[in-house]
Amino acid sequence: DEYGLKLIAAQFNHGLRQEQSDEDEIFCRSLAQKFGVDFLTQKMPDPSIPRGMSPEDYYRRERYRFLDRVAADRGANKIAMGHHLQDQAETVLLNILRGSGLDGLKGFLPMRDRKYIRPLIDVTRQDIIASLKEAGVDFREDSTNSSHVYLRNRLRGDLIPLLQKKYNPRIEQNLARMAEIVRRDDDWISGHVDLILTSPRIQYQQNQASFSAEYFKSLHEALGFRLVKALLEGLSPEGRGFSSSHIQAVVDLVISSPSG
């Protein structure tokens, strides 16, 4: 009320830890009731993972579908996520190991699509826990965080502590800072690509887009690559699924073609 906000708590029960998952749901419901916040939850509708999709991607898709539905039903204009600074550092390091481009090195965005916000993205896990203890608020930890089945957990439990001890005690803060720098540079590139996409340089017809090979060759290679990426994703029904090698193959094809 102090800030003129109406809060709704939404929790997606993946059901991966059976009884513990149900206990998490009960805990969240109780905590929401304690603070007078409406609470909505849903269990994973279908545990079977579609072919060609990783478990993590499937769980994420279903989780966001649930959150989007809750926001639409309740007229909420923002969806606040709980990611903190350590989550950001882990994501950036994970994407470095995967050989990601700027999209991956940006990590979690503080705001995405003007709807998803991450108010704790610059706050450390330690500070969050300290604040909860000071306020006398109970909390639960996901028991799978200590499992080494997932690569992210191995980074959290093994690699990051090693980097902190042997190389840089502020590695998490530095990775998060790097994400900020990359976001700034990526925003500049994205802005220029958006201008090109809406300019007469690009001709659209049904599910096709065309442009002059001569014009494309005049672009900086970073802009050219991102332009092809944006066009492919914009024309694709799924809006994704193109690897860097796919995009580069199209770029090479255009560059090798006669000007015109």
Residue locations for each model-derived region?
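AMP-forming adenylation/ATP pyrophosphatase catalytic core
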Residues: 1, 8, 12, 44, ...
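Core alpha/beta nucleotide-donor-binding catalytic domains of modification enzymes
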Residues: 1-161
